[in-house]
């Protein structure tokens, strides 16, 4: 069975709404089923699935998922938002910018884009609407800014990329900091432009900020400092050599539980079991996709797909700039129709040799790949962030996408800068 037939069958499975994990499992088994001489028998695929999830670094993923859910229940996003509103709330676009900064910080806690949208959006979208911002704009800005959750470290997709390519998780986390800040800054620039052009209800905004400031800086900081310290502790443990990324993920869970139970007292001990069940329900599908993606990736390697694709692309695109643009367009399209985990695990082994042949750093390519897929979070038809945000406000997905289009444009501008200026990603390494 040829690789082209395998990919066509995979697309057909997706089109007829077979779950991604099952689709991957089916197409991983088919080559061996139709050709008894092919190395990848059914037992090989099963062993590959089990081997794919038998990884110590991978343990960081469920831990970050659990930490994000604990912090969502613990109302930590509210504490983060309050401190940013205190300082910049009265400035032009101060409230939308505070939302974007909150997404940056919450992304540095949860490592997940949909989790960031759900936690920050459920709290900030009603407030934005109360202060006079239109529902479409309020929903769109949270949906797009939530994409920062997979770029700012710790990032679950970076862990997946490290697993697929053998690169350092710590280096990938470090490489994501400046790109995440750059994209956040561009989104804030757009928010400023939008508010300048369409205006704001300054009376309502000033009243809300004045009410918050009446509590005093000490009171706000006392409430917020524990939330602000969370990403500092997690990343500090990694880069100070105190803990590996996996161990830091466990630390983040205990820190989130400690702060939520004993400092903010926003969750009760009896709620912990429900939180753990929610985390398991969130992670279980990811684990199944991960196992099936690993098996499918190994089958493609046995079929020599990476070598074939690499040879074809390098033969037809000799200009490095054109090659990188083509790869970016391909990844953008993939991000629109495929979940992040299988996209990374299947495509990294195929595309990495191609970009390495033109001298591109694997860490740099990892950042470019994740930013491409992050744009897919807010792009129809699969854009997960759009559906999460829509569930919060009942705004139709396509209306959110239309309002988000200018912000996606700034995301694309950042992508171009990151692609052709490697120093943005690599300057901290």
What role is predicted for each listed range?
Residues 1-429:
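Alpha-helical transmembrane segments of multi-pass membrane transport proteins
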């Amino acid at each position: 069975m040829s690789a082209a037939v395998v990919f066509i069958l995979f697309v057909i499975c997706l089109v007829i709404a077979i779950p991604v994990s099952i689709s991957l499992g089916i197409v991983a088994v088919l080559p061996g089923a139709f050709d008894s001489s092919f190395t990848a028998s059914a037992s090989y695929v099963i062993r590959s699935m089990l081997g794919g999830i038998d990884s110590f670094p991978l343990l960081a993923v469920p831990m970050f998922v659990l930490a994000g859910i604990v912090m969502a229940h613990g109302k930590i996003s509210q504490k983060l938002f309050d401190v940013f509103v205190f300082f910049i709330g009265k400035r032009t676009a101060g409230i939308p910018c505070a939302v974007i900064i909150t997404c940056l910080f919450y992304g540095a806690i949860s490592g997940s884009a949909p989790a960031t949208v759900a936690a920050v959006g459920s709290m900030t979208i009603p407030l934005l609407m109360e202060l006079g911002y239109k529902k479409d704009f309020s929903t769109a800005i949270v949906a797009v800014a939530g994409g920062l959750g997979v770029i700012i470290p710790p990032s679950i997709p970076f862990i997946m990329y490290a697993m697929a390519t053998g690169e350092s998780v710590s280096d990938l986390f470090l490489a994501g900091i400046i790109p995440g800040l750059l994209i956040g800054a561009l989104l804030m620039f757009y928010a400023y432009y939008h508010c300048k052009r369409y205006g704001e209800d300054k009376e309502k905004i000033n009243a809300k900020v004045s009410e918050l400031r009446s509590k005093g800086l000490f009171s706000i900081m006392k409430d917020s400092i524990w939330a602000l310290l969370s990403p500092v502790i997690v990343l500090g443990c990694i880069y100070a050599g105190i803990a590996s990324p996996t161990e830091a993920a466990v630390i983040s869970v205990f820190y989130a539980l400690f702060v939520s139970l004993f400092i903010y007292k926003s969750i009760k001990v009896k709620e912990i079991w429900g939180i753990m069940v929610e985390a398991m329900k969130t992670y279980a599908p990811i684990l199944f996709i991960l196992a099936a993606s690993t098996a499918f990736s190994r089958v493609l390697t046995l079929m020599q797909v990476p070598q074939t694709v690499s040879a074809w692309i390098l033969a037809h695109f000799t200009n490095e700039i054109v090659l990188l643009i083509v790869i970016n367009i391909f990844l953008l399209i993939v991000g629109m129709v495929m979940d992040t985990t299988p996209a990374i695990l299947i495509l990294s082994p195929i595309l990495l040799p191609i970009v390495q042949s033109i001298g591109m750093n694997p860490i740099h390519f990892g950042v470019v790949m994740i930013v491409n897929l992050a744009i897919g979070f807010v792009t129809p038809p699969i854009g997960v962030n759009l559906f999460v945000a829509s569930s919060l406000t009942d705004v139709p997905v396509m209306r959110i996408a239309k309002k988000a289009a200018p912000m996606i444009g700034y995301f694309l501008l950042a992508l171009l800068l990151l692609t052709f200026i490697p120093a943005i990603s690599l300057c901290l390494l």
